[in-house]
């Protein structure tokens, strides 16, 4: 059976297949660059694992308090060495990226301190953590003030107003690397380093925290290499590569990580407790494979950008821009387009492919959201997934794919659904 016939069995028409193949053939040089980045990052991870003498004993389970968990302690040192930080928390008790960010914020801020976002509004779920949207237990309720400096119209930092916003009470600056549910560009590690240097020149003792979700292993360096005091991420995104069943990490300066640990558990216990309950093997294996899986997700994102840009849709990043994370935003312009795209992604999944996603009132968001994720791990966005808020400009955010081939199928399937509903013409 030839490849085209196999795709036909999966519901891909000849026209969609041919269109996709033409696009794929034009991307060989771009894909080779991703291969080189992945190889570099793979060697970084292997070196850190060998340096810390990872052994079979590290895969054992701990229970109860989790004292002296060799696997947990070694894994945290592997992360710290890979990311070039003094310390790192890597815990299954951290439920998601938002939780990791909240732990870091509450652990390092005190009543009367000010939190500054110099990159505009943070991700929707962080609004209630901070208190931008009123919520019980927010930072605002605990007396932490929040300031925000929006980006300039071209998506760059407003240095003039950032300088005005930083004052003697500014304790922590939070920088979201990825675009979130926005159509602004995601930031490069170099840009983040320049922003951190600018802020620290004004106030050297300010803590700079980077939300690194969706950004790990996209480049050969991380925000921790350019001055970030804290770097936060989720294990059901890039560093877990679809194998980690749960978890998050907080890496950075030893004092900042320790402060976060007292919020994760409690004062006096900090990093010393936290049973791993048998997940260590998956956390290690996920981190080991993460550079390769991230590479496949990047190829899928670039493929999506090229497909939809050729059809006239605004895409961020565009088809030729450098990649700073694995997310591809496509502005579809209509609710019908957003729904069709997500339903196509779902139909390409190995799990729950028969399910039809519909918009729903998702906790933490101010509008209905549609999500497609036929994943092995619930909510895993390093696996093939797409989502978007049901409000103008009806942009979809596509990411993931444990293999490039699966990401490719997902994009072709999304296009097929839009063609079938007469939302696009090839």
What are these regions, as identified by a protein language model?
Residues 2, 6-24, 28, 35, ...:
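Conserved PLP-enzyme active-site core in the AAT-like
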Residues 62, 82-85:
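Flexible linker/loop signature enriched in Pro/Ser/Thr and Pro/Gly
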Residues 63-71:
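N-terminal small-domain helix-loop-helix segment of the aminotransferase-like
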Residues 86-89, 113-116, 171-172, 205-208, ...:
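Structural motif
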Residues 309-426:
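Conserved C-terminal alpha-helix-loop-beta "cap" of PLP-dependent enzymes
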């Amino acid at each position: 059976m030839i490849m085209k016939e196999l795709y036909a069995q999966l519901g891909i028409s000849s026209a969609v297949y041919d269109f996709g193949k033409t696009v794929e053939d034009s991307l060989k040089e771009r894909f080779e660059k991703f291969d080189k980045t992945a190889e570099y990052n793979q060697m970084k991870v292997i070196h850190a694992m060998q340096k810390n003498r990872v052994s079979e004993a590290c895969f054992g389970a701990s229970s109860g308090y989790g004292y002296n968990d060799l696997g947990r302690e070694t894994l945290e040192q592997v992360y710290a060495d890979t990311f070039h930080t003094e310390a790192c928390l890597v815990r299954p008790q951290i439920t998601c990226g938002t939780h990791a960010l909240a732990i870091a914020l509450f652990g390092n801020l005190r009543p009367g301190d000010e939190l500054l976002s110099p990159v505009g509004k943070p991700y929707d779920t962080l609004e209630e953590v901070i208190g931008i949207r009123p919520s019980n237990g927010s930072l605002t309720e605990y007396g932490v003030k929040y300031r925000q400096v929006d980006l300039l119209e071209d998506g760059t930092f407003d240095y003039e107003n950032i300088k005005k916003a930083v004052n003697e009470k500014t304790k922590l600056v939070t920088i979201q690397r990825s675009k979130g549910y926005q159509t602004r560009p995601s930031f490069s590690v170099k840009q983040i380093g320049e922003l951190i240097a600018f802020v620290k020149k004004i106030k050297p003792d300010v803590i700079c925290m980077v939300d690194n979700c969706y950004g790990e292993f996209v480049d050969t360096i991380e925000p921790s290499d350019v001055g970030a005091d804290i770097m936060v991420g989720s294990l059901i995104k890039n560093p877990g590569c679809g194998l980690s069943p749960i978890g998050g990490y907080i890496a950075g300066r030893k004092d900042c990580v320790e402060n976060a640990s007292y919020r994760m558990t409690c004062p006096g216990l900090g990093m010393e407790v936290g049973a791993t309950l048998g997940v260590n093997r998956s956390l290690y294996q996920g981190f080991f494979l993460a550079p390769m899986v991230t590479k496949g997700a990047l190829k899928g994102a670039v493929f999506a950008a090229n497909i939809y840009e050729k059809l006239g849709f605004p895409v961020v990043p565009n088809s030729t821009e450098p990649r700073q994370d694995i997310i591809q935003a496509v502005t579809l312009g209509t609710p019908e387009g957003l729904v069709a795209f997500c339903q196509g992604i779902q139909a390409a999944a190995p799990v729950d492919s028969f399910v039809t996603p519909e918009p729903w009132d998702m906790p933490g968001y101010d509008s209905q959201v549609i999500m497609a994720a036929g994943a092995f791990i619930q909510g895993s966005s390093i696996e093939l997934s797409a989502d978007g808020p049901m409000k103008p400009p009806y942009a979809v955010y596509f990411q993931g794919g444990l293999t490039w081939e699966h990401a490719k199928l997902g994009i072709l399937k999304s296009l097929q659904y839009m063609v079938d509903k007469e939302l696009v013409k090839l």
